[in-house]
């Protein structure tokens, strides 16, 4: 396949040729077909609860639901995603793990697009604020044996675990999980600075949606947000949907962590991508999606999750946080690829010999979203805007 456009990395007008699952060559051309048509590494979203009406946390989740979730995000330029399971009874988590594994086993492209599962609960704080929208009745202490049962149901596909380090035996779980090859994250926590430091020493490497899943009011200092910002061993995932973090906080967190240690995530729910309206959801109950993609509890101003794809986060990083398009895409492709170890397979970059996971889109700095034209997964055009594929 031949694709022309400007490389997000350096703005060069190029023709990219793919051969099977790899990029065969990249040649400079006199000028791109359009100065606003960009070629980037495929977008990678490590926190996705659902999208387009497809819910990884639905009580009746099936392999088809997972497949449809992946396909709905191909249309938004996402070539890899981590289906994210929130706090639920063990039976529900096992069922979701089995559904995700079955979807991956049935289709190599789906497997390529799901590098791992992210378990965002249930080993989190039960306090209001840090717990977020997770159901209190299913929050429980860390249990390494239960974690093993999830992994068995997923046939080894579980890759990220978010945990509150103040819980009993949390640091032991972090240490054992890290030894097992999991990426351990701190999130939905009310931990003290000392407990944050202990978690980092035990092996935690990620802060899950830093600045959210937190108390509405915190001590000026010290607190668990400052402590996580200060640790160079922690990468921070951030929700840039325009509602979860104000622009000043977006800018400050990126500057504090540096571009090397930030990953953008959507944290999207199943109502993401749907028309504005009122919806009944498995998590959060009745919610209302506003025209500006703000998702709230019905009749309340309180957020009930996120409803924007990762592409909106990239646009907001440019419009609201002052990043360049190059930087914003890096936080949404190259950085998560490195965090998950996908860079070792040539993902997260556009160069000869790399994996042909590509997103082609149009964008100007005033746009509120990317306009995705082509999505390639392992060299296959899984979405083309003018054909409706995907």
Regions from the language model: what does each represent?
Residues 1-31, 380-381:
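N-terminal metal-binding scaffold of metallo-dependent hydrolase/deaminase domains
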Residues 38, 46, 58-112, 137-153, ...:
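Alpha-helical scaffold segments that flank or form the walls of functional sites
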Residues 49-51, 55, 67-96, 113-125, ...:
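Divalent metal-dependent hydrolysis catalytic cores, especially in the metallo-beta-lactamase
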Residues 97-121, 127-191:
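Metal-dependent enolase-superfamily TIM-barrel catalytic cores that perform enediolate-based chemistry
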Residues 148, 152-276:
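Active-site core of metal-dependent hydrolases
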Residues 223-237, 242, 254-266, 272-354, ...:
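His/Asp/Glu-enriched, well-ordered alpha-helical/loop segment
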Residues 347-390:
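C-terminal cap of metal-dependent C-N hydrolases
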């Amino acid at each position: 396949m031949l694709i022309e456009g400007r490389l997000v990395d350096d703005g060069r007008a190029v023709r990219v040729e793919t051969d099977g699952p790899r990029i065969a060559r990249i040649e400079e051309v006199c000028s791109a077909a359009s100065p606003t048509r960009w070629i980037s590494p495929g977008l990678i979203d490590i926190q996705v609860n659902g999208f387009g009406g497809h819910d990884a946390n639905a009580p009746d989740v099936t392999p088809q639901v997972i497949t449809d979730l992946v396909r709905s995000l191909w249309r938004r330029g996402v070539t890899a995603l981590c289906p994210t399971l929130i706090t639920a009874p063990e039976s529900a988590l096992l069922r979701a793990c089995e559904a995700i594994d079955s979807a991956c086993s049935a289709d190599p492209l789906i497997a390529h697009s799901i590098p791992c599962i992210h378990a965002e609960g249930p080993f989190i704080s039960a306090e209001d604020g840090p717990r977020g929208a997770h159901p209190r009745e299913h929050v429980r202490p860390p249990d390494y044996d239960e974690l093993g049962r999830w992994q068995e149901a997923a046939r080894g596909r579980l890759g990220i675990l978010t945990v509150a380090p103040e819980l009993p035996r949390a640091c032991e779980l972090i240490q054992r999980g890290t030894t097992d090859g999991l990426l351990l994250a701190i999130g939905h926590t009310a931990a003290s600075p000392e407990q944050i430091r202990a978690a980092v020493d035990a092996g935690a490497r990620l802060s899950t949606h830093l600045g959210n899943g937190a108390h509405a009011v915190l001590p000026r200092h010290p607190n668990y947000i400052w402590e996580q910002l200060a640790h160079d061993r922690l990468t921070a995932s951030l929700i840039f949907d325009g509602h979860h973090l104000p622009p000043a906080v977006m800018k400050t967190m990126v500057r504090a962590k540096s571009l090397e240690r930030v990953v953008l995530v959507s944290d999207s729910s199943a109502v993401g991508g749907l028309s504005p309206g009122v919806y009944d959801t498995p998590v959060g109950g009745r919610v209302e999606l506003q025209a500006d993609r703000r998702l709230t509890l019905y009749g309340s101003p309180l957020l009930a999750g996120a409803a924007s794809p990762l592409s909106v986060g990239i646009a907001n990083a440019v419009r609201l946080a002052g990043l360049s398009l190059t930087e914003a895409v890096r936080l949404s492709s190259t950085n998560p690829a490195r965090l998950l170890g996908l860079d070792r397979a040539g993902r997260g970059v556009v160069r000869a010999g790399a994996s042909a996971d590509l997103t082609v889109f149009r964008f100007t700095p005033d746009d509120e979203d990317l306009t995705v034209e082509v999505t390639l997964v392992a060299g296959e055009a899984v979405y083309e805007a003018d054909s409706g594929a995907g």
